[in-house]
Curated annotation (Swiss-Prot):
This is Large ribosomal subunit protein uL11. One of its GO terms (molecular function) is structural constituent of ribosome. One of its GO terms (cellular component) is cytosolic large ribosomal subunit. One or more lysine residues are methylated. One of its GO terms (biological process) is translation. The keyword Ribonucleoprotein applies. HAMAP family: Ribosomal_uL11. Gene3D superfamilies: Ribosomal protein L11, C-terminal domain, Ribosomal protein L11/L12, N-terminal domain.
Length: 142
């Protein structure tokens, strides 16, 4: 018989840098999960990614206090900031532009995000990511 799911915990954890401090410790501790076991497994799974890149993770906690987790791709805004070489988006995106991003870069980000964005073709994903870029104050070229 399948194990009974007790909770789903959604977090954003830096790749290769999971440790028992907040937000990981309190979120998993209150569910009775072995925090260090999660940290070691998460760090092992994300060691190939750029260290410090925020990775969304969904942790499924079962009634016997065991767990499984699924990592997602980094948020589009993080990938856009990295591609444009900026630290943060514009506070006034319609008037103050902070950088530019090319269509090729948007294509690359859409391909990266394709695993998480279900039910959309590549053109729809590109439009979505271009919209995110514009809302951050980036100029989309192409």
């Amino acid at each position: 018989m399948a194990k009974k799911v007790e909770a789903y915990v959604k977090l954003q954890v830096a790749a290769g840098m999971a440790n028992p401090s907040p937000p990981v410790g309190p979120a998993l501790g209150q569910r009775g999960v072995n925090i260090m076991e999660f940290c070691k497994a998460f760090n092992a799974r994300t060691e190939s990614l750029e260290k410090g890149l925020p990775i969304p993770v969904v942790i499924t906690v079962y009634s016997d206090r065991s767990f499984t987790f699924e990592t997602k791709t980094p948020p589009a805004s993080v990938l856009l900031k990295k591609a444009a070489g900026i630290k943060s988006g514009s506070a006034r995106p319609n008037t103050a532009k902070v950088g530019t991003i090319t269509d090729a870069q948007i294509q690359e980000i859409a391909a990266t995000k394709a695993a998480d964005m279900t039910g959309a073709d590549i053109e729809a994903m590109k439009r979505s990511i271009a919209g995110t870029a514009r809302s951050m104050g980036l100029v989309v070229e192409g």
